[in-house]
């Protein structure tokens, strides 16, 4: 017989048999080796075929092992040959293939030949219950009336079980999540499926709106007999395109597999509905030069109604791939799946609540569900409901479960800090100077304090963890019982159903109630101590997840933050002197937004700061960023003098398609995408090209901006500050006049420079006063304090006398240039002389650097601290 006429599976089995014989030092390959190889390969299908023929497969393997041990062994001879008995069986296999009209010899015919074999392999199968007629019937059933005409003839059998996932079976087992709502879409899908031709719906919607869930809902309705008569008993099979493509090395293999799937579907007489997720991947799948792709192979079956198909894809991909192929598009009927509103999302989350509680072993409260829907809708703008809301619930549950299973976050932070200090202690121990010794004492003291705190927390944690036991296992048992009850109800076995419903289920629910109350009592008994383990997901936990994901502080304000907001003016006045109106207006805007009273569709605040140079416009913006985020890093500063040309607008929002830099994104839009909660400073705004203001219109009004790539960037959580020197000559000339009078004059000047629609969208135009002599002294004190902080890092202290302070303020005061000359005065009169004295060794660690004004000059006299 010709070995090249064996199927790939049979060739593989013979090669495995040869390896098995060589490993066991058998000189000849016998039928029992081939039988062992066939049963050892899960992809061969031999085991399932024998089981279908009534053979007790579990009795075959031990008998094969025993027969292999009884074969003669030859040491040192690697030349393994085909035995006479195997040759005889292969000849009979060849004759059987010829009788059946097969071009290639398949492995199941080898099993058929073994039925008449007098050797060990035939005896083992007959003892396990093999009958030739039963095996022939099983082979005919598997082949489905087809001959083996190719080397891959065996591989493409039972293609549906290999390349699809049965969603109706998963629904029967209770493995699918419940589908809430979407009744109109499911009804429309059923309606299309009942058509005579072109009965193929395609679900089109944005990612995460629930397209796959609609198909799962259909599968659940079929299982529960909640569908029209024509759909009852049908199966919904999800096509696994990755499995179809994987391992198809040569041209034609993928097409053979897909053809086998289509053939089995045609033979099932419409009993199967195929679901193709990401339908656009079929258009072009397996495409090679001169070959058909999967989409073209599906067209005839779709048009004739042989293939019941449900597709799912996004709007963009449908337009890009499916609409281009008009012949494929006309075979599908569109079902548009929109994004559910917040109320519908809350209903969906309530339906999924029990599943997520069971998975994470925590309790999800109703306020958490409402918060997940509302906060995700407001703050996560680049994704869609209900997916983004489900993600919040899932992540909050995972976070609390992680705290229960591992160390609580507060203990973990303490542990890491202790390790860090221990490493630092070992490094400092090697040094002998005074500074290192002092640092070592500080480290030892802090370590002792942290270790005590850690030990206290550890005691509380162990006690709480001991209390939180048992509820998870009981909940899982209740879930299993409910799934079993649903299956019994479908089968009509009401006696067993009643036994579970009125016996086992109430008992489990009573146990769960007792375990919950014990857990609550454990948490309440130590009310004086902090509770480490949380077992509930509440609105606060959802807000924490949103805050971490977006950087936006949406969590409920703690008392400390409330007090901080009420004293906001005091904080800003520490850095900005003499601008009471500006500080008050900015503080009011921030308080409105944090209290939840501001318009949620606009930025927190948009201000135009006007005034002469050096009066604190930019400094107030820096102070605001420092107040909100404890860091000036969250200030996005854009110098508008860089945008003087018309084409420079593209730098703000990104270049349009076809231009260089399209992939890079815009300077402003990318910065806000990364830090959605920030202060945006547009410095010297009057120097920008007028077209730049057209871009800012939608930012100021709607809190959104579309970048060059078509993505919407959310500005609703930003504070926008624009600074300008316009009208500064009026402000200086009208010094001392009422604020409203000055503002009126400056407003007239603004109207000549900016368009009305731009000015109309700004929340407040803030006029900064020119600085006076008493303001300069306060600013000098702030500047000298910063210099003192820099000296403290070198273990020196700055001491400036009142006379020196007054002289610095006098020499640094210039009504035209504001506070900037003061900085230069401090540099020249204080910093330069002190720098020389430090380098000369006059001042060193633990010294006081005194600054005094005597006899018309600054004096620096060294004294020990």
UniProtKB/Swiss-Prot annotation:
The Clp R domain sits at 3-145
Q: Where is this region: C-terminal?
A: 771-865
Q: Does the keyword Ligase apply?
A: no
Q: Where is this region: Repeat 1?
A: 6-71
- Any one Gene Ontology cellular component term annotated for this protein: cytoplasm
Q: Which residues form a coiled coil?
A: 390-524
Which intervals of the chain are annotated as region NBD1?
A: 158-339
* Gene Ontology MF term list: ATP binding; ATP hydrolysis activity
GO BP = cellular response to heat; protein refolding
Its keywords, alphabetically, are: ATP-binding, Chaperone, Coiled coil, Cytoplasm, Nucleotide-binding, Repeat, Stress response
Q: What does the annotation say about its assembly with partners?
A: Homohexamer. The oligomerization is ATP-dependent.
| Name under which the protein is recorded | Chaperone protein ClpB
Supply the source organism for this entry.
Answer: Bordetella pertussis (strain Tohama I / ATCC BAA-589 / NCTC 13251)
């Amino acid at each position: 017989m010709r070995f090249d006429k064996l199927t790939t599976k049979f060739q593989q089995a013979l090669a495995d048999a040869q390896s098995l014989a060589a490993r066991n030092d058998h000189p000849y390959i016998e039928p029992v080796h081939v039988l062992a190889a066939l049963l050892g390969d899960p992809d061969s299908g031999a085991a399932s075929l024998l089981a279908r023929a009534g053979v007790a497969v579990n009795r075959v393997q031990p008998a094969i092992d025993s027969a292999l041990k009884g074969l003669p062994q030859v040491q040192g001879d690697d030349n393994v040959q085909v035995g006479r008995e195997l040759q005889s069986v292969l000849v009979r296999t060849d004759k059987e293939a010829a009788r059946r009209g097969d071009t290639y010899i398949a492995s199941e015919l080898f099993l058929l030949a073994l039925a008449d074999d007098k050797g060990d392999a035939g005896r083992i199968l007959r003892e396990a219950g093999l009958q030739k007629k039963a095996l022939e019937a099983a082979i005919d059933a598997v082949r489905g009336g087809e001959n083996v005409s190719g080397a891959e003839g065996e591989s493409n059998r039972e293609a549906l079980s290999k390349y699809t996932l049965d969603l109706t079976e998963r629904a029967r087992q209770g493995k699918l999540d419940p589908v809430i709502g979407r009744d109109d879409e499911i009804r429309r899908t059923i309606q299309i499926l009942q058509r005579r031709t072109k009965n193929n719906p395609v679900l089109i919607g944005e990612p995460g709106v629930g397209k796959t869930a609609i198909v799962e809902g259909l599968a659940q309705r079929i299982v529960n007999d909640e569908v029209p008569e024509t759909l009852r008993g049908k199966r919904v099979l999800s096509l696994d395109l990755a499995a179809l493509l994987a391992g198809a090395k040569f041209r034609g293999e993928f097409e053979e597999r897909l053809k086998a799937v289509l053939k089995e579907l045609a033979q099932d007489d419409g009993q199967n509905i195929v679901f193709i997720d990401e339908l656009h991947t079929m258009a072009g799948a397996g495409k090679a030069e001169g070959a058909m792709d999967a989409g073209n192979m599906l067209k005839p079956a779709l048009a004739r109604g042989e293939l019941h198909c449900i597709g799912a894809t996004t709007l963009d991909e449908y337009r890009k791939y499916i609409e281009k192929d008009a012949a494929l598009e006309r075979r599908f009927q569109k079902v548009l799946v929109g994004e559910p509103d917040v109320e519908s999302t809350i209903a969906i989350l309530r339906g999924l609540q029990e599943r997520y509680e069971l998975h994470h072993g925590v309790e999800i409260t109703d306020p958490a569900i409402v918060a997940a829907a509302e906060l995700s809708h407001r703050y996560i703008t680049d994704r869609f409901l209900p997916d983004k809301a489900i993600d919040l619930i899932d992540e909050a549950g995972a976070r609390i479960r992680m705290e229960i299973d591992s160390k609580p976050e507060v203990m973990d932070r303490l542990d890491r800090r202790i390790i860090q200090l221990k490493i630092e202690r070992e490094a400092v121990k090697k040094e002998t100077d005074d500074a290192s010794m002092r640092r070592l004492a500080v480290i030892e003291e802090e370590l002792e304090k942290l270790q005590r705190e850690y030990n206290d927390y550890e005691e509380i944690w162990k006690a709480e963890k001991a209390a939180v036991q048992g509820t998870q296992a009981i909940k899982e048992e209740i879930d299993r019982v409910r799934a079993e009850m649903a299956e019994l109800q479908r089968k009509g076995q009401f006696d067993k159903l009643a036994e579970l419903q009125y016996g086992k289920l109430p008992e489990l629910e009573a146990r769960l109630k007792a375990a919950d109350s014990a857990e609550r009592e454990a948490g309440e008994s130590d009310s004086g101590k902090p509770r480490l383990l949380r077992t509930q997901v509440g609105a606060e936990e959802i807000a924490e997840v949103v805050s971490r994901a977006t950087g936006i502080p949406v969590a409920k304000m703690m008392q400390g933050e409330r007090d901080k907001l009420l004293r906001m003016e005091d904080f800003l006045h520490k850095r900005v002197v003499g601008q009471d109106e500006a500080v008050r207006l900015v503080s009011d805007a921030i308080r409105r937004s944090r209290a939840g009273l501001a318009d949620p569709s606009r930025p927190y605040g948009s201000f135009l700061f006007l005034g002469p140079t050096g009066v604190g416009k930019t400094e107030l913006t820096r102070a605001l960023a420092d107040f909100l985020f404890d860091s000036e890093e969250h200030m996005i500063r854009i110098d508008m003098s860089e945008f003087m040309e018309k084409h420079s607008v593209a730098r703000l929002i990104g270049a349009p398609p076809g231009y260089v830099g399209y992939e890079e994104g815009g300077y402003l839009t990318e910065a806000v995408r990364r830090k959605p909660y920030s202060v945006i400073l547009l410095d010297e705004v009057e120097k920008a090209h007028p077209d730049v203001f057209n871009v800012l219109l939608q930012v100021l009004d709607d809190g959104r901006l579309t970048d060059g790539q078509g993505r919407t960037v959310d500005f609703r959580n930003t504070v926008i500050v624009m600074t300008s020197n316009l009208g500064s000559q009026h402000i200086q000339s009208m010094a001392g006049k009422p604020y409203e009078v000055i503002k009126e004059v400056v407003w007239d000047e603004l109207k000549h420079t900016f368009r009305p629609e731009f000015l109309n969208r700004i929340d407040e135009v803030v006029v900064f006063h020119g600085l006076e002599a008493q303001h300069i002294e306060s600013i000098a004190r702030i500047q000298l304090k910063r210099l003192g902080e820099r000296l403290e890092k070198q273990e020196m202290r700055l001491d400036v006398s009142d006379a020196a302070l007054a002289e610095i303020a006098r020499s640094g005061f210039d009504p035209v240039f504001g506070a900037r000359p003061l900085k230069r005065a401090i540099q020249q009169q204080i910093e330069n002389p002190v720098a020389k004295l430090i380098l000369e060794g006059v001042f060193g660690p633990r010294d006081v650097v005194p600054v005094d004004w005597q006899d018309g000059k600054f004096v620096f006299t060294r004294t020990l601290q």
